[in-house]
């Protein structure tokens, strides 16, 4: 046992380490959580033994069938992308559970004591032998069985909490059923602003300039996850959009490798513009990129549309019409 003074000092040091480490992870807002869960569902439900049944379970916050590898890997995917599980450490991160609650507690219907219990439960799980889907799932299943309501609450899984957050943040966050592009346009080219006159050309792939355009491209590239929060390029995310419209991403990937190597900018907005120019200026890539970019605008309205059957099979002409309709609104 620690003597009282040493115990207090040790507790202070541990608390300080937790505080120091906290900024390395950012709590997740409803928009981020919707993106994470929908993306993990897209990746894993087709691999389930009964895809339709598994998807319905996951949409209802039920991690079933528990013996299906797809369910196990979906769970691991969500936990890793949120940050509640760190594969490199093979550990669950209880401190992040509390950080999630502390960041958003005024919106959440979650009791602090229950959140504290969940935090402690995570922290008491020893490092796993591996970060396999089955091992992560088995460890989490025991926690979820006892704390499922609290987990759902801190992850904005109850409608009223996310509704309050969206209402308070307004134009500062992409709203449900709002395309990511229109969100960024409302922030950077709002109606009545002097720069609004530039928006129509930008929507039609004319290159903008200045700090407003830089902020706009940063908003879009980070919102689409083409760039990470640390300003790193995620070329696989761009490739994913190419594949969805049945375009091969190989030429784009090779070109973007060179583009990244030539990057000299440090400012996030300038970095986004640099990457955008590369995609627009390469004659072998630009037409496919525009097609992929247009469809991503349409799909960004509802992250769950492809999962719930609301998204029609891809048709270039249908997408072009939808984008033209948006242009009419934004160019007026």
Curated annotation (Swiss-Prot):
Disulfide bonding pattern of the chain: 40-77, 73-133, 184-219, 200-331, 259-278
SUPFAM superfamilies per UniProt: Insect pheromone/odorant-binding proteins
GO cellular component: extracellular space
Tissues with expression: Saliva (at protein level). Female salivary gland (at protein level). Detected in the head and thorax of the female mosquitoes, where the salivary glands are located.
Protein induction: (Microbial infection) Up-regulated in salivary glands following dengue virus type 2 infection.
Main location: secreted
Residues binding noradrenaline, per UniProt: 185, 203, 216, 294, 297
Protein keywords: Disulfide bond, Hemostasis impairing toxin, Platelet aggregation inhibiting toxin, Secreted, Signal, Toxin, Vasoactive, Vasodilator
N-terminal signal peptide: 1-21
InterPro entries: PBP/GOBP, PBP_GOBP_sf
GO molecular function, one term: toxin activity
Domain of life: Eukaryota
Residues the record lists as binding leukotriene E4: 61, 157, 176
Cellular localization per UniProt: Secreted
Disruption phenotype: Mosquitoes show longer probing times when fed on mouse or chicken but not when using an artificial membrane feeder or mice deficient in leukotrienes. Reduced blood-feeding success, defined as the percentage of engorged mosquitoes after a fixed amount of time, when fed on vertebrate hosts. (Microbial infection) Significant reduction in the numbers of oocysts in the mosquito midgut after infection with Plasmodium gallinaceum, the causative agent of avian malaria.
BP GO annotations: sensory perception of smell; vasodilation
Biological function: Modulates blood feeding of female mosquitoes on vertebrate species by binding and sequestering different mediators involved in the host response, such as biogenic amines and eicosanoids. Binds serotonin, histamine, tryptamine, noradrenaline, leukotriene B4, leukotriene C4, leukotriene D4, leukotriene E4 and U-46619, a stable analog of thromboxane A2. Does not bind adrenaline. Exhibits vasodilating activity. Inhibits agonist-induced platelet aggregation but not blood clotting.
Family: Belongs to the PBP/GOBP family.
Record text about domains: Lipids and biogenic amines bind independently through different binding pockets, with lipids binding to the N-terminal pocket and biogenic amines to the C-terminal pocket.
Subunit record text: Interacts with human CD4.
Name by which UniProt lists this protein: Long form salivary protein D7L2
Organism name: Aedes aegypti (Yellowfever mosquito)
């Amino acid at each position: 046992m620690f003597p009282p003074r040493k115990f207090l000092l040790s507790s202070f040091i541990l608390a300080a380490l937790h505080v120091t480490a906290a900024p390395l992870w950012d709590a997740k807002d409803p928009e981020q959580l919707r993106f994470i869960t929908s993306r993990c569902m897209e990746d894993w439900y087709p691999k389930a033994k009964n895809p339709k049944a598994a998807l319905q379970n996951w949409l209802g916050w039920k991690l079933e069938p528990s013996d299906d590898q797809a369910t196990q890997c979906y769970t691991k995917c969500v936990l890793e992308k949120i940050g509640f599980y760190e594969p490199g450490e093979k550990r669950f991160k209880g401190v992040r559970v509390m950080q999630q609650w502390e960041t958003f507690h005024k919106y959440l219907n979650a009791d602090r004591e229950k959140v504290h219990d969940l935090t402690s439960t995570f922290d008491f799980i020893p490092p796993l032998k591996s970060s396999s889907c089955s091992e992560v799932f088995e460890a989490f299943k025991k926690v979820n069985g006892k704390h499922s309501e609290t987990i759902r609450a801190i992850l904005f899984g109850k409608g009223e909490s996310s509704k309050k957050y969206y209402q308070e943040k307004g134009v500062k966050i992409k709203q449900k059923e709002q395309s990511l592009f229109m969100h960024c346009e409302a922030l950077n080219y709002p109606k009545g602003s002097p720069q609004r006159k530039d928006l129509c050309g930008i929507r039609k792939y004319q290159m903008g300039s200045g700090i407003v355009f830089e902020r706009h491209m940063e908003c879009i590239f980070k919102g689409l996850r083409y760039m990470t929060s640390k300003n790193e390029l995620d070329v696989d995310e761009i490739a994913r959009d190419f594949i969805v419209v049945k375009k091969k991403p190989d030429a784009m990937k090779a070109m973007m490798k060179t583009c990244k190597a030539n990057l000299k900018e440090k400012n996030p907005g300038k970095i986004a513009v640099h990457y955008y120019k590369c995609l627009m200026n390469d004659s072998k890539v630009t037409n496919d990129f525009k097609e992929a970019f247009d469809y991503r605008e349409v799909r960004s309205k509802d992250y769950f549309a492809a999962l719930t059957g609301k998204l029609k099979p891809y048709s270039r002409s249908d997408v072009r019409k939808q984008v033209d309709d948006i242009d009419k609104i934004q160019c007026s």
